[in-house]
């Protein structure tokens, strides 16, 4: 693929990621507004969020299989269109069940985005620069989370009803679907030719290495989700005012935005294994440091923790292409993203139950130690992944 086409593909996928992650995470801002508008109780609020997350987790793997026949670009455009239409319908919702249905379909549409965009980028950057490209794409999603949530907050402060920005987001989704279809080449062109027969099965070149990569993802995802869920509670336990503690997660995410990009660059320059070791050791040390430092010192450390905590994901996604045949990438990415989504559902519950038994500080300490299990797993990858050439 020519460099200009690769760049256009990356830009389009980054824009799509901004829209989809914005649509997915704006629900955090919308939930209290929906509860106030429709008189919802906390159980109903939880059901709304769960419906969206379950749809995203459940449909990622089917999307990977369907894309192998339908084409990654085509299914990505269709899913983006579905999410846009669902958000327009959400803007005209009349009650709880309509909200549930619209956000379920929005989650179904967004489920295709991560595995298919990652596959498309991997096709556009099959060799050098793939991890940097995926790190850039990974960074773009966090931009969407901040922008969409910020737009709703500003509209509410300005006296504009939440329905207006929600419908606007839906229109943005439809426009993005058209852009995807127009600007990304037909990814069915990457299907095997007669000269290169179709790979049977999952197309995994090195099953032990792929399994180890999935295990790294499991440990990394559970640590990340658990830490983000309970860091504010740790700060409150240290005596930090609740208003400051509420800013803990945004601070981690701000650092994480930088980490997602720069860790992809580091992996391209210094190799996958070294980068995983650096980021996971830094993550463990950072988490344990939040226990050792005074309250406000911990607060200001959080962006640095976020760089390492969030950055490993770019390395993981950028490594899948080394282990899987190109025509089987959609299902491979779907597996890894589904693993992360399931961990995001289970980890808060597991760490929450543990915290009730042994306390918040010991629970955070366990998370900081468990993340170091990624180090021996990273060594399993060494034999399968050649160190990328330094530019």
Predicted regions: what is each one?
Residues 27-28, 208-260:
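Extracytoplasmic gate region of multi-pass secondary transporters
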């Amino acid at each position: 693929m020519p460099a200009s086409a690769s760049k256009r593909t990356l830009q389009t996928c980054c824009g799509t990621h901004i829209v989809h992650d914005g649509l997915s995470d704006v629900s955090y801002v919308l939930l209290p507004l929906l509860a106030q508008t429709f008189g919802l109780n906390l159980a109903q609020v939880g059901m709304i969020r769960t419906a969206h997350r379950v749809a995203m987790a459940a449909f990622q793997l089917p999307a990977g299989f369907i894309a192998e026949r339908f084409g990654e670009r085509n299914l990505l455009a269709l899913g983006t269109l579905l999410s846009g239409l669902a958000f327009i319908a959400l803007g005209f919702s009349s009650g709880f069940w309509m909200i549930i249905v619209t956000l379920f379909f929005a989650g179904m549409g967004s489920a295709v985005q991560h595995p298919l965009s990652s596959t498309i980028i991997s096709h556009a950057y099959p060799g050098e620069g793939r991890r940097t490209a995926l790190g850039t794409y990974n960074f773009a999603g966090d931009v969407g989370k901040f922008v969409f949530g910020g737009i709703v907050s500003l509209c509410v402060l300005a006296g504009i009803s939440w329905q207006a920005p929600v419908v606007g987001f839906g229109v943005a989704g439809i426009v993005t679907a058209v852009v995807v279809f127009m600007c990304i080449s037909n990814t069915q062109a990457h299907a095997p030719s007669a000269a290169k027969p179709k790979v049977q099965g999952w197309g995994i070149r090195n099953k032990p290495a792929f399994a180890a990569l999935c295990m790294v993802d499991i440990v990394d995802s559970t640590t990340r989700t658990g830490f983000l869920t309970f860091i504010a509670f740790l700060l409150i336990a240290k005596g930090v005012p609740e208003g400051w503690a509420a800013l803990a997660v945004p601070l981690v995410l701000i650092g994480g935005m930088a980490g997602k990009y720069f860790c992809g660059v580091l992996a391209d320059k210094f190799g996958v294994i070294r980068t995983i070791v650096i980021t996971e050791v830094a993550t463990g040390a950072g988490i344990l440091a939040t226990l050792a430092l005074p309250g406000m010192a911990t607060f200001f450390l959080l962006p640095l923790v976020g760089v390492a905590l969030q950055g490993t994901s770019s390395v993981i996604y950028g490594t899948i292409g080394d282990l899987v045949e190109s025509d089987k990438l959609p299902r491979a990415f779907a597996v890894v993203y589904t693993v992360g989504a399931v961990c995001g559902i289970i980890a808060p519950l597991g760490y929450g139950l543990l915290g009730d038994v042994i306390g918040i500080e010991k629970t955070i300490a366990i998370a900081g130690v468990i993340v170091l299990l990624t180090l021996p797993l990273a060594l399993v990858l060494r034999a399968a992944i050649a160190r990328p050439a330094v530019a």
